[in-house]
Amino acid sequence: MDNKEQFTLTVFSENRSGLLSRIVGLITRRKINIETLTVSTSSMEGIHRFTIVLSISEKVVQKVVAQIDKQVDVLKAFYYRNKEIVFQEIALYKVPVEAMYNGTKVEKIIRKHNARILRIESEYVVVEKTGHERETEALLEEFKKIGIYEFVRSGRIAIVKEMERLNKYLASVENELQDN
């Protein structure tokens, strides 16, 4: 049996409706769980970027990426191990404002985790933390001890450490688009 590990897929595409559904369907048909999914514009005008995190074997990720590459409107798909990328997630926490009145405990927690206060309202405080999943989870566990109203974490955003492969491909796509 192949060992599972975490891979980050980066898919470059044109902005077409229905593509997200096709990509998700392609993955879920294989009974693969999507850990996180983020879609945004890329550095190239008119090109969108999907960042998908999967925990599977390398053999399976190669097949998934090959299938995604065959989709109409997909320009190119890549996969990376965690050591090949720089990645972060953002988390928001809504905690009771009363927690702020109990001395400096909450302030110390926020500083310890390199988080920041985004908003203070009459009933709650919104705290933001950017980091890896284990870091945002650690802050969540601290806030659970003092009370938390709400928690949400984004999907992964990632940039590839090695530039050559991606830059060459994007340059070839840009040249191809200009020729058409």
Feature names for model-found ranges:
Residues 1-49, 53-180:
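Long, contiguous binding/interaction regions
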